Design a protein with these regions (language model features):
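Conserved catalytic-core segment of nucleotide-activated headgroup transferases in glycan assembly
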Residues: 319-415, 476, 482
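Short hydrophobic/aromatic-enriched beta-strand-loop microsegments
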Residues: 308-314
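Charge-rich, low-complexity intrinsically disordered regions
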Residues: 1-177
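Short hydrophobic "strand-cap" motifs at the C-terminus of beta-strands
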Residues: 267-269, 358-361, 460
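Carbohydrate-associated surface elements
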Residues: 296, 315-318
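Extended catalytic core of nucleotide-activated donor transferases of GT-like folds
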Residues: 176-183, 191-306
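Catalytic binding pocket for nucleotide-activated donors in carbohydrate/polymer assembly enzymes
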Residues: 189-226, 278, 295, 302-303, ...
Length: 522
């Protein structure tokens, strides 16, 4: 709506007024609520801002802070010019006017990231303020603050209860059609790099390697790379596995620029309730697309307007079991002699040497489970690797064999136990599928978020923590239980190894990459 000025404006001020009015970024309600002296005057809020407000350092909306903008662009206020008009003319289409603690990203990227965060179902502005009470509510855009300051400062940006409710809603939702995110016959990049951080978790390296192999099987030119690669020599398309880890460790920080991120695909492996997931949020929200190891998480990114797909790599025929050099490792020497030889994943349930195995880090939820059931487990032949992790499981001499050890032990185990780190029930694909099912072990798990391929009581067995001992006792000690276990074990192996399933996954991921690659920037 046009403003009829009750007082004379200079030609420059009149042009400024028209520029601001046309942008739609002046928030009259905000201006009047914050500057109540203007509300009591007879001058319209926009006219007041153009004539007086910008000279007094007043904000025209929640996002534009004149002092911050002038620190970044000192010339914007030269000759008594309005810095907000400079912003509108220089950064058209943006609503964020400063970089906060993310100086290596363009304002255009940050604006997209903040708007996407607003739509992400895990984020609620009022809840972010409730968690971070030191933030001034009236003058702050919560999504902008969360992206530019909250994540870099290590603040929590999602509420735990709301994350739980959102996951439940995502499980119940119909979801968006995969066909909207797949271009079967579209263009693909000439070269692709799948990146992992060499200083990070060794399991992430495995996922990245499997993804790279799957992309090659899809007919794409793909190479496995790490953070030590020269960014100037990067392939046409970069896929960063575990961005919460890659961009925070060592030389990975050199890759955290808007120029790289906006054209890349992120492969998210982290759970939404964790601080690690929140650390990866800026890279996920400003990327060209997201691949997620969790079906529900992919749906959440789609709801936020991001091209996203749920995908897990094919698992090849080769297995990475213990090597000769691993045999002197302390955790290998405690294995029974019969379990030190190379396992055969096709060994039937009844013929395996270990009854139950578990690999995982310490958490309060797991601590309660194992303390409560210690007496029960003591009667079986177990291998439990359970410790407090303060750093990633990396390639150090202490940790290097652990990934191979987990697969090796699962290859000798009847049952692989899956106890969640907390109460969220995330489907831990690497532990459940890659680590256990692919090595012929039967997974007994607490209830998980629904998975589109692997179903409870078909490919794995699911029970509440309280009744898991009863289920295990039935599986190990009764003919009916052993028959059911073998049925489940074989069904899981078929789901992993059937060539048609693997070809379908290849077609799907190629189609998604083609969709992202051939979709023009907004």
């Amino acid at each position: 709506m046009s403003v009829e000025p009750p007082l004379a404006l200079t030609p420059t001020e009149q042009q400024d007024l028209e520029t601001i009015e046309k942008s739609g970024l002046f928030d009259a309600d905000f201006y009047l609520s914050v500057h109540q002296d203007v509300a009591g005057s007879k001058i319209g809020p926009l006219l007041h801002y153009v004539r007086y407000g910008f000279r007094e350092g007043r904000q025209p909306n929640r996002n534009f802070r004149p002092a911050s903008y002038l620190r970044q662009y000192p010339d914007a206020g030269a000759n008594n010019r309005n810095p907000f008009v400079h912003f509108l003319k220089t950064h058209g289409g943006c609503h964020i006017a400063h970089h906060g603690l993310l100086p290596r990203f363009h304002l255009e990227d940050l604006s997209i990231g903040a708007r996407t965060l607003e739509q992400l179902p895990f984020f609620v502005p009022d809840l972010y303020h409730d968690i971070n009470r030191d933030i001034e509510r009236a003058t702050t855009d919560m999504a902008e603050h969360a992206l530019l300051y909250g994540v870099p400062e290590g603040r929590r940006i999602f509420g735990a209860l709301h994350v739980s409710r959102t996951l439940g809603a995502l499980c119940a939702a119909k979801g968006l059609d995969d066909a909207d995110y797949i271009a079967p016959d579209g263009l693909v990049p000439d070269s692709i790099g799948v990146f992992y951080n060499s200083r990070g978790n060794v399991f992430i390296h495995e996922i990245a390697s499997d993804l790279c192999t799957t992309l090659r099987e899809s007919g794409l030119d793909c190479v496995l790379l790490d953070e030590t690669t020269n960014p100037d020599d990067r392939p046409e398309l970069c896929i960063f596995v575990a961005p919460h880890e890659f961009f925070h460790l060592g030389q990975g920080q050199d890759w955290a620029t808007g120029t790289i991120i906006r054209d890349a695909i992120m492969f998210n492996t982290e759970q939404p309730q964790t601080l690690w997931f929140e650390r990866g949020i800026p890279f996920l929200l400003m990327a060209a697309g997201v691949i997620d190891i969790c079906h529900q998480m992919a749906e959440s990114f789609r709801q936020a307007g991001l091209p996203a797909i749920h995908f897990t790599p094919n698992i090849g025929a080769e297995r990475d079991y213990l090597q000769k050099g691993d045999m002197q490792h302390a955790m290998v020497r405690v294995l029974p002699p019969a379990c030190r030889s190379r396992p055969d994943r096709h060994t039937p349930f009844a013929d395996r040497q270990l009854d139950i195995s578990f690999f995982g880090g310490m958490s309060e939820h797991r601590e309660q489970f194992f303390a409560r059931n210690a007496g029960f487990f003591a009667q079986f032949r177990n291998y439990f690797y359970y410790r407090k992790f303060t750093t990633p499981i990396d390639s150090s001499p202490r940790d290097n064999p652990l990934s191979r050890l987990a697969s090796h032990v699962a290859g000798h185990s009847r049952i692989a136990l899956n106890i969640h780190r907390d109460d969220y029930g995330f489907f831990e694909w690497h532990r459940i599928v890659k680590g256990a099912m692919a090595n012929g072990s039967v997974v007994v798990s607490e209830p998980c978020l629904p998975h589109p391929v692997f179903r409870p009581n078909v490919h794995f067995l699911e029970e509440s923590g309280r009744h898991i001992p009863n289920l295990i006792e039935w599986l190990l000690n009764t003919p009916d239980g052993q028959a059911k276990a073998e049925e489940v074990r074989l069904a899981a192996m078929r789901a992993i190894e059937t060539p048609a399933h693997n070809r379908a996954r290849c077609t799907r991921i190629r189609g998604f990459i083609s969709h992202v690659w051939s979709t023009p920037e907004a």
